[in-house]
Amino acid sequence: MTLAELKINESCEIVSVGGEGALRQHFLDMGLIPGAKAKLVKFAPMGDPMELLIHGYELTLRLDDAKKIEIKKISDIESENGNIKSPNKQIPHPGLGEGGKFHNKKEEHPLPDDEVLTFALAGNQNCGKTTMFNRLTGANQHVGNFPGVTVDRKDGSIKGYDNTLITDLPGIYSMSPYSSEELVTREFILKEKPKGIINIVDASNIERNLYLTMQLLELNIPMVIALNMMDEVRENGGSVYINRMEEMLGVPVIPVSAAKNEGIDELIDHAIHVTKYSEVPKRQDFCDEDGEDGAVHRCIHAIMHLIEDHAKAAEIPIRFAASKVAEGDSKIIELLNLDDNEKHMIDHITYQMEKERGLDKSAAIADMRFRFISKVCEETVVKAKESKSHKRSSRIDKILTGKYTAIPSFILIMGLVFFLTFNVIGARLQSLLEMGIDKLGNLVDGILTSTGVNPVIHSLVIDGIFTGVGSVLSFLPIIITLFFFLSILEDSGYMARVAFVMDKILRKIGLSGRSIVPMLIGFGCTVPGVMSSRTLSSERDRKMTILLTPFMSCSAKLPIYVLFTSLFFKKYAALVMILLYIGGILTGILVAIIMKNTVFKGNPVPFVMELPNYRMPGMKNVIMLLWEKAKDFLQRAFTVIFLATIVIWVLQTFDIHFNMVTDSKDSILAALAGIITPIFVPLGFGNWKISTALLTGFMAKESVVSTLSVLVHGNSEILAILSPAGALPLLVFCLLYTPCIAAIASIKRELGIKYAVLVVIGQCLIAWIMAFVVRMIMII
């Protein structure tokens, strides 16, 4: 019987795990190991993928992949039960390294005072790692509750300790190189060799998190464990025997709450202490010499002796290298530069281990780790029957991931987000800001007139800077409002559910459910959308997602939509904007289907993802994100757009002999724009001023509006040079043509110059074709 045959609320024990290579290793790392007990919670609304409860957390799995896992049915397993027992009275927590308990001062060899203490901040996705980074460094960084929020390494010094450098690494589940994020983290630790590791462990899901911890301990680097979210554990009636956990793991364990700023000072003290004195983990061997793990123990130790010289030469910690060689990690084996004879000996050693253990080598290593983790949890973790957050999540999921309610809920939520952004909150705030900018402009205009400032300077300030930059600034409330709602959806954990719900739909166009998140982020800004695609383990899925993300209309295009819909489609402005967003999505789907059947043939990778509990979005996190986005927008408004505005003003104010013109049609700009204007004549907007605005939009989409504001004299002139039959094709062209230079740069960074050029040319061509189709429909 396979896992795919299991029915809802039925439980099973895994007998064997199929698949091969990195995919199978990923299954094992996620806890799908022989002997593990699981329960089928539900199916996605489309009947695929499924949601499993295993090791106390929810995991998604497609039916095609579930068919590779052999099971046997068992009686019902407890949903979130850990080791249920009454906690003892409060026990003091002296901790490793404190009071000389584990620190021998006679043998200490502290690092020089002037040496920078470098730390790697490592942990699973959704463990609160980025929030911890903000606490430790004071840095402002986006915090979300979807797997893979951190897509780049972020550096900062610990507050109050200038001689430190802490790096926030991507959230990962193991040190196996399945996704690019896991590879980034592993390569950073192995190559850059931080002097200390701060491992963030979610205290409400210790069993899941300790799998990575065990591999980090094998690296023989000074390390502390931050047991995060302890406030939630206590609220649920749970507890952790910290001292016993320290003894079993051999490193300091500090109970903390990054969200409530509890235990942070103690964590910093421990981290700096163990790193300063190079106190490596006391334990790296987790398999018993006897019993079921005896064969694994003998195998790893035999390999350690065999590869010792190679590991030293490659500067890879020997225990870590041996474990990875034992489980068949090809990248580590390659780095060790073993000869054929040594490889044959390793094959014999692992074959003997498989024969004695009754499991293949990868499953045996994973099973050994989970056995030790179970032992740690049995002796140290006191769990309540079910956490409040899990109960709340189950109730919410009945609606948001329900068979008949999930898709309508998604449409309703996104529709509400756009309605509030464009018609209620954002629009009203925009009106207030516009009034303020107009009053300030009139005030400055009066001052410049009364002081007799040179007419050229006067024109530059009022007609150039105030008109151009001011017009873009007025759209800040709409952009911030959209980011506000998107960040709440992401921070709450809803985005992970959207991926779960939409997986089967996206698979029809050749993508994975995980691809929905970069594309949804793309509605805010294409750049982070492209960057967040690094969470996708498949190169094929990643490339397709990056190429499709620009079709999701970014917030920088909002000023264009608002300007033209308010002028030409006032009664139906909201409807037209919603149709534009839908049009971008449908075009992306069409392009995806074409790519799926041509350049990107093949199937998307398995959808194996943890579903985090819903959490109330932290308002501080949301406000920090909004401030970052507002700051970024303002920086662009006063740099790229400011410079573009001045350049546009100069080009449209002077002729080629730098004489001031009375009519802008005689300007340098008119001559330059005239070259490309004929291209847009069939689309209904063959005017040099509009052509110029579209050109500057390549720098930043907000520049389209600011450029037009400089070139035309009020909205009446726009109405004179455009008709509704030309305005709608123009909106479609703006929706689909090349993304801004920052987005192109991020695409180049991820995929190379060839794909970046392809996006520019391809999207301009698609935009022209779609705008032409709309033009033909409008004039029929």
Residue ranges and their predicted role:
Residues A363-A364, K383, V424-I465, I509, ...:
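Extended, low-charge hydrophobic alpha-helical regions
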Residues S409-L420, L482-S487, T565-L567, L580-I594, ...:
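Hydrophobic core segments of alpha-helical transmembrane domains in multi-pass membrane transport
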Residues Y277, R283-V453, M660-L669:
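Extended helical scaffolds that flank P-loop GTPase cores
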Residues Y161, R186-P252:
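Conserved C-terminal guanine-recognition region of P-loop GTPase G domains, centered on the G4
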Residues V233-F286:
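Canonical P-loop GTPase G-domain recognition
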Residues H93-S174:
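Conserved G1/Walker A P-loop phosphate-binding module
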Residues S555-I578, A742-L751, A771-I780:
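Transmembrane helix-loop junctions at the membrane interface of multipass transporters and ion channels
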Residues M435, K439-L443, A496-T526, K601-L625, ...:
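Juxtamembrane inter-helical linkers in multi-pass membrane proteins
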